[in-house]
């Protein structure tokens, strides 16, 4: 007979304690990272982050657009690197969705980047090469290029510090095919995990050769992981 009121009182006290704890949370960022505290964004277009041979056998310069909150004085900012959609055959760093999402996150206080990465070339597609093998290779190239962009920012943080990013807070993301590439960056770390028909070793392995080599004095470990 006494247990029910006691349990009710205990639950009431627990609820009150949780409410008090929630009220005691202190906002240490002034709304940064979850509210658009910056009205304007500054964009550096066409920043070269690497180069690599594409599916057409041409050495392609890899470019990205970097978005930063205007008049931001913070010394070290987290950076989010985005890869666009398009099924590894189409799309661009300037796609409307990429521009929108990069702008929105930059207004929250992040440094953001939208990258162009190597796509399956049109000649291969119309020549009958639009198949599982070539799409898989394009997915690997996209992952390698995204890794190169991550290495670019970590190398920059260790050298010129142009973009003032925190090398410990580098985030990758994307839309559709770009999201797939981001998942590969996060979870694919062994050549043995890739089907043999892809021939990943000939493509440059997991890290790739798209730029900013993973083993340098500034970054003695694979910089993209």
Residue ranges of model-derived segments:
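N-terminal cap/lid segment of alpha/beta-hydrolase-fold proteins
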Residues: 24-75
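Coil residues (strongly favoring Ser/Thr
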Residues: 28, 100-103, 132
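Short beta-strand element of the alpha/beta-hydrolase
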Residues: 75-86
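Serine-hydrolase catalytic-loop signature spanning alpha/beta hydrolases and amidase-signature enzymes
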Residues: 87-90, 112, 152
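Cap/lid segment of the alpha/beta-hydrolase catalytic domain
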Residues: 88-97, 116-140
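Short amphipathic alpha-helix adjacent to the substrate-entry channel of hydrolases
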Residues: 94-114
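Primarily recognizes the serine-hydrolase "nucleophile elbow" in alpha/beta-hydrolase
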Residues: 148-225
């Amino acid at each position: 007979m006494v247990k029910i009121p006691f349990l009710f009182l205990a639950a009431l006290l627990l609820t009150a304690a949780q409410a008090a704890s929630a009220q005691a949370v202190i906002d240490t960022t002034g709304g940064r990272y979850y509210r658009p505290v910056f009205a304007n964004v500054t964009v550096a277009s066409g920043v070269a982050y690497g180069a690599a041979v594409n599916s057409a056998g041409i050495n392609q310069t890899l470019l990205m657009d970097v978005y930063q909150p205007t008049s931001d004085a913070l010394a070290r900012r987290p950076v989010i690197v985005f890869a666009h959609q398009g099924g590894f055959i189409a799309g661009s760093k300037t796609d409307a969705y990429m521009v929108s999402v990069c702008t929105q996150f930059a207004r929250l206080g992040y440094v953001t980047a939208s990258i162009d990465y190597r796509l399956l070339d049109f000649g291969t597609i119309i020549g009958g090469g639009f198949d599982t093998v070539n799409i898989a290779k394009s997915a690997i190239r996209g992952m390698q290029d995204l890794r190169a962009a991550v290495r670019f920012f970590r190398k920059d943080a260790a050298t010129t510090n142009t973009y003032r990013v925190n090398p410990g807070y580098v985030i990758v993301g994307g839309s559709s095919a770009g999201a797939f590439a981001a998942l590969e960056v996060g979870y694919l770390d062994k050549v043995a995990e890739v089907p043999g028909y892809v021939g990943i070793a000939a493509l440059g392995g997991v890290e790739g050769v798209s730029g900013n080599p993973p083993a340098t004095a500034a970054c003695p470990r694979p910089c993209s992981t």
